[in-house]
């Protein structure tokens, strides 16, 4: 017996992505000094010539996400109309909460506010006003803009995968623009750019992570801080991630994620308790207010009248980093958000992770600034000497330093492993055309490649090379994401138009497609509580017969129609060339018998308190009404009524 194929992927995407990534690896490995020079030139060019584009793109993503949530499109579900959320609101919030954590906040939680305080982009450093502006800038870089980028990509992936039935890959978001060409080279190129962005974005995080692990081990065990040690750490931790991938330890990774959440919450609560608690509670409120009050002006600030290098090393680096991470984080939040409305999705994704990040930066950043201003510790000197060491020198000033530094080091390692494992999974799904059940070796390949890219970038210039990799890889993805916004808006506008022009068919009382129904039949249908056996008989003798007649007639008129039949579901489809197909499903569903109908029980049932419904679904999901009890002519009338609405919708699309 032949087993599954050894290679389960989209060959153009897999091979194209691998070739480009290894071309970069070969270039950096063979000429590290030249590579460092090229990276520096690329970063300078992007900052000088394309900084405005990054700023405009990220502003667009935030306005677009908020606009969708506030518009009538916000009511549309990420899935069929009758889909229920896969996770409870509490569990969903918890997963979004965990998405807001990562290697980045460990690396920059102390360092970024201190660096902005000592060397602000404008004005004098080392002052109370500089401290206030430092927290504003940190919130700006890690707040709503970052999560708007993720929300746009996640929303597009969720909508087109769960509501339109397209592959769970970035190419699907361009379907409204290029149609089925997403399955050809235009779609392959989109997915290749998504893979490159994810690869270099995750590699940037891994590089930052090993720099900080090295700093922690130096503090705890005296291990020297060198590139050699950091490359060895990349290899070691990437190996751990590879083992988890090869072993299929989904439960283990889930437990690691839960451990991440527990340790991160412990650290932030500890700092709030051990630090200046009342000041921190006041600061989180004031920081949030200051951030929100200046968000518009800050969004569009490019320091055009007084150019400096600050924006390239900070704001543009972050925008490129977040954009390069968008397929990774976007796919995660898409997969956990099926059944949510667009409004729920945007509000949750923007506010929950941002809220946790604000708490983290206030706890670590404001406490570090308080130490500096009070003279309790020289945090500026520590950070300027070695950014990666900042967290550990900060924790050294608080009680139980050895314990908290050990916990912080463990947390960075677990973040590293889960990021690498999840990143390799996302890249594998994209290169496999949306298939989540591809071969294990493919996922192992991407896990090892991530570690290799991180190590090579460290050898090519450390933090500067990592920053350049993030900024450069984000540019093509930013262009794609703008097209994604347009494609998603086009699809949602059609969706609203469909909802306007295709009103839900009413149940029996409406007359079913203009066919009069005697009142006694209406009453009988309303009170009827059929068994499963009778429901299946109805599907076989009435629904199937009715739809077979319509299929025959439709085909006789030269249209392409199809019918799919089993005992509990019948699906009728009419194709319209390049226009949207019409689909009419009738499915049996068991429901709890209403209390008033208990006395009507008759016959054998699968449960003493269950009855059955024959519910209608269209392309956009369940319509919420039951046709069990209709005659054959009434079923045909209902189908034609829905088809008439669909044709009207297609007409409205053609005419504008």
Give the residues covered by each predicted segment:
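Amphipathic, interaction-prone secondary-structure segments
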Residues: 549-603
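Membrane-embedded translocation segments of transport machinery
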Residues: 194-340, 347, 352-405
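Helix-loop-helix connectors at the membrane interface of multi-pass transporters/channels
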Residues: 1-8, 12, 167-185, 209-232, ...
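Terminal cytosolic tails of multi-pass membrane transporters
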Residues: 1-8, 70-80, 349, 361-397, ...
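N-terminal alpha-helical transmembrane segments of multi-pass membrane transport
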Residues: 1-130
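Flexible loop linkers connecting adjacent transmembrane helices
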Residues: 2-4, 37-43, 70-89, 114-137, ...
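Membrane-water interface regions at transmembrane-helix termini and the short interhelical loops
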Residues: 1-6, 31-46, 65-86, 134-141, ...
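Helix-loop-helix module between adjacent transmembrane segments
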Residues: 5-15, 19-29, 62-66, 101-105, ...
């Amino acid at each position: 017996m032949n087993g599954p194929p050894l290679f389960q992927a989209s060959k153009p995407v897999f091979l194209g992505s691998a070739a480009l990534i290894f071309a970069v690896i070969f270039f950096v490995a063979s000429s590290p000094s030249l590579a460092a020079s090229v990276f520096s030139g690329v970063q300078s060019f992007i900052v000088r010539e394309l900084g405005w584009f990054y700023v405009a793109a990220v502003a667009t993503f935030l306005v677009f996400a908020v606009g969708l949530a506030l518009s009538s499109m916000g009511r549309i579900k990420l899935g069929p109309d009758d889909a229920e959320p896969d996770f409870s609101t509490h569990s969903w919030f918890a997963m979004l909460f965990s998405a807001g954590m990562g290697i980045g906040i460990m690396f920059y939680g102390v360092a970024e506010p201190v660096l902005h305080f000592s060397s602000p982009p404008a004005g004098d450093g080392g002052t109370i006003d500089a401290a206030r502006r430092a927290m504003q800038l940190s919130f700006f870089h890690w707040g709503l803009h970052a999560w708007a980028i993720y929300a746009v990509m996640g929303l597009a992936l969720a909508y087109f995968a769960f509501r339109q039935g397209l592959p769970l890959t970035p190419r699907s978001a361009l379907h409204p623009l290029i149609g089925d060409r997403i399955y050809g080279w235009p779609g392959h190129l989109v997915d290749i750019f998504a893979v490159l962005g994810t690869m270099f974005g995750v590699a940037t995080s891994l590089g930052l992570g090993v720099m900080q692990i090295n700093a922690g081990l130096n503090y705890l065990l005296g291990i020297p801080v060198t590139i050699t040690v950091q490359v060895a750490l990349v290899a070691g931790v990437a190996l751990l991630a590879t083992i988890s991938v090869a072993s299929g330890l989904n439960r283990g990774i889930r437990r690691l994620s839960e451990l991440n959440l527990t340790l991160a919450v412990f650290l932030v609560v500890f700092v709030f308790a051990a630090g200046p608690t009342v000041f921190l509670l006041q600061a989180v409120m004031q920081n949030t207010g200051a951030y929100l009050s200046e968000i518009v002006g800050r969004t569009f600030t490019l320091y055009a009248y007084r150019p400096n290098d600050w924006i390239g090393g900070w704001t543009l680096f972050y925008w490129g980093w977040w954009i390069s991470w968008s397929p990774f984080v976007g796919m995660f939040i898409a997969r956990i958000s099926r059944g949510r409305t667009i409004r729920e999705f945007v509000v949750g994704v923007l506010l929950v992770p941002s809220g946790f990040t604000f708490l983290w930066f206030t706890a670590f950043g404001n406490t570090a600034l308080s130490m500096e201003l009070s003279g309790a510790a020289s945090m500026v000197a520590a950070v300027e000497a070695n950014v990666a060491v900042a967290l550990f020198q900060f924790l050294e000033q608080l009680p139980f330093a050895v314990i908290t530094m050990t916990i912080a080091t463990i947390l960075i390692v677990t973040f590293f492993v889960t990021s690498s494992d999840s990143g390799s999974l996302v890249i594998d799904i994209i290169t496999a055309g949306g298939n989540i059940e591809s071969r294990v070796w493919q996922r192992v390949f991407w896990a090892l490649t991530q570690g290799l890219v991180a190590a090579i970038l460290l050898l090519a210039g450390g933090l500067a090379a990592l920053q350049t990799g993030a900024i450069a890889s984000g540019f093509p993805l930013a262009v794609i994401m703008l097209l994604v916004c347009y494609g998603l808006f086009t699809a949602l506008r059609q969706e609203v138009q469909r909802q306007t022009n295709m009103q839900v068919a009413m149940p029996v009382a409406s007359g079913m497609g203009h066919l009069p129904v005697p009142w006694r039949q209406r009453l009988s249908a309303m009170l009827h509580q059929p068994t499963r056996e009778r429901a299946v008989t109805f599907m076989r003798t009435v629904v199937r017969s009715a739809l077979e007649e319509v299929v025959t007639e439709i085909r006789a008129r030269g249209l392409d129609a199809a019918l799919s039949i089993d005992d509990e579901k019948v699906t009728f489809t009419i194709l319209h060339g390049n226009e949207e197909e019409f689909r009419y499903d009738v499915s049996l569903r068991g429901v709890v018998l209403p209390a008033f109908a208990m006395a009507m029980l008759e016959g054998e049932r699968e449960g003493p308190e269950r009855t059955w419904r024959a519910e209608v679904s269209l392309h956009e999901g369940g319509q919420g009404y039951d046709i069990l009890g209709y005659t054959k002519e009434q079923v045909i009338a209902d189908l034609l009524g829905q088809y008439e609405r669909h044709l009207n919708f297609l007409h409205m699309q053609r005419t504008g």
